């Protein structure tokens, strides 16, 4: 990476020239964002509790050269000489990445999730081929970024970003190297310069950690991710924000932290999440619990159920025993008077669906080609943090709390779904226009994901609690309006999600941030 950085030609530009210009090809429309001076630089964040690093100093970072040294003076001279005559494309890159490293890499991850959220089609033999991580661009492409997969990808991304930034903050305030423009006022800074020390570069830390995780999660996108990494690092010198040694130290730290995070990912049980050999036993176990009519795929040909063993994947904020203890009890089953009442409610909606009900069902559908409910809530979290002018590390903390809650919600919900294996309304003649999920009904994934995220966001942004909770309620009821869930699936999914969110909050309250 050092060689790549040193070979780039960098030039700078003032922020007044850059305002309003962006450079990213987006398949999903996102709000335009620009850089800001954070409300707080969170100078004590190097002491915050990490998820996987034993301490903020587990990975060593060498001390930088003094700002009076000949080596650093040479770096400043190179930066100054390159900080002029930017091309329009370079100007656009400065503004795009200046909106925030954590913000942009989360956005990129969501776009990749949407791009890969396409279920495999059946072949001529009536079989559904399984995407192959070793050949990710073959048909069907790997991964199928369904809600559980996306929740996991975003969780690992956010944890890597957060742990890497906690370590970076520790070394920033240990070494206290000032930003280049504060050492040499003749260097034009094209983005807001805060009191945050520059070594190691927070942007390089986030970029390197993010690319390592995303290459593992989306292995067919390696050239694209390498290009984004190169552009991000270059933009920091085009903007006059970092010298090469800032970037090199940050890149090395981000790579090392991400390698540790991927160590967990390789052993968390995801490799067995699609074990279809387990489904026969799951169905028999569900029958022993009173489920007389288990779920059946309504696709033709019948599609194997989505990730039946995702419920066995390792959680973040509670252990396996707790997962089983908080599993919702199913209050009634197919054939009961209570179930019939809920089926009749769906039939009534099918016959007399209002425009508002249809709008809500479609707005929250988050089906194929979208970044799914976990991505929807990550976007809400990132936007709220950006609007609040959070520092990079506080933004990363926000997304790590939401991300781990969302992955835990996916695991706990999927464990519940295959524990009870209940049929969807479509097995009893109802139709849907929002896409029919290929897995059991109870409980609602949308409800569980949404309540978990809204609970965490209400803790982080208490002045917006009512808004987030109302959105979770709407996301939940959207599945009733879409005719793919019974009311009990949604109501108990919401309760389950809130409990899961509360575990993430407990972790947040104990992380040393005082937030």
Task: Locate the predicted segments by residue.
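Hydrophobic helical h-region of N-terminal Sec-dependent signal peptides
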Residues: 13-17
């Amino acid at each position: 990476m050092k060689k790549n950085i040193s070979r780039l030609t960098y030039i700078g530009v003032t922020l007044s020239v850059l305002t309003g210009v962006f450079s990213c090809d987006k398949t999903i429309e996102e709000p335009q964002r620009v850089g800001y001076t954070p409300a707080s630089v969170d100078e004590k964040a190097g002491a915050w509790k990490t998820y996987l690093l034993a301490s903020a100093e587990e990975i060593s970072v060498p001390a930088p050269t003094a700002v009076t040294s000949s080596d650093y003076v040479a770096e400043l001279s190179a930066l100054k000489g390159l900080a002029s005559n930017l091309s329009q494309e370079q100007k656009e890159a400065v503004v795009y990445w200046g909106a925030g490293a954590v913000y942009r890499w989360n956005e990129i991850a969501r776009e990749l999730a949407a791009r890969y959220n396409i279920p495999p089609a059946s072949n001529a033999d009536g079989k559904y081929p399984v995407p192959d991580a070793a050949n990710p661009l073959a048909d069907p492409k790997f991964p199928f970024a369904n809600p559980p997969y996306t929740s996991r990808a975003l969780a690992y991304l956010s944890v890597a970003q957060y742990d890497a930034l906690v370590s970076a903050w520790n070394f920033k305030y240990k070494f206290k190297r000032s930003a280049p423009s504060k050492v040499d006022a003749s260097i034009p800074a094209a983005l807001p310069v805060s009191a945050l020390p520059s070594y190691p570069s927070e942007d390089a830390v986030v970029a390197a950690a993010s690319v390592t995780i995303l290459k593992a999660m989306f292995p067919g996108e390696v050239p694209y991710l390498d290009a984004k990494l190169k552009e991000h690092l270059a933009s920091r010198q085009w903007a006059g924000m970092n010298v090469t040694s800032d970037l090199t130290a940050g890149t090395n730290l981000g790579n090392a932290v991400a390698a540790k995070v991927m160590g967990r990912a390789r052993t968390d049980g995801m490799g067995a999440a699609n074990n279809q050999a387990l489904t026969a036993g799951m169905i028999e176990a569900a029958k022993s619990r009173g489920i007389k009519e288990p779920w059946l795929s309504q696709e033709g040909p019948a599609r194997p159920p989505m990730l039946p063993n995702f419920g066995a994947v390792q959680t973040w904020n509670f252990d396996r025993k707790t997962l089983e203890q908080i599993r919702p009890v199913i209050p009634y089953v197919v054939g009961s008077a209570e179930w019939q009442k809920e089926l009749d409610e769906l039939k009534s909606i099918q016959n007399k669906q209002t425009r508002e009900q249809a709008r809500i069902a479609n707005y929250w559908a988050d089906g194929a080609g979208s970044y799914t409910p976990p991505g929807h809530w990550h976007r809400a979290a990132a936007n709220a943090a950006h609007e609040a002018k959070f520092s990079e590390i506080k933004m990363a903390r926000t997304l790590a709390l939401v991300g781990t809650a969302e992955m835990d919600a996916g695991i706990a919900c999927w464990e519940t779904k295959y524990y009870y294996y209940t049929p969807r309304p479509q097995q009893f003649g109802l139709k849907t226009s929002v896409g029919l999920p290929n897995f059991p009904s109870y409980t609602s994934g949308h409800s569980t994901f949404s309540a978990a995220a809204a609970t965490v966001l209400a803790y982080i942004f208490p002045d917006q609690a009512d808004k987030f909770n109302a959105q979770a309620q709407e996301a939940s009821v959207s599945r009733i309006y879409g005719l793919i869930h019974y009311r009990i699936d949604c109501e108990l999914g919401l309760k389950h999600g809130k409990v899961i969110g509360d575990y993430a909050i407990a972790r947040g309250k104990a992380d040393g941030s005082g937030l």
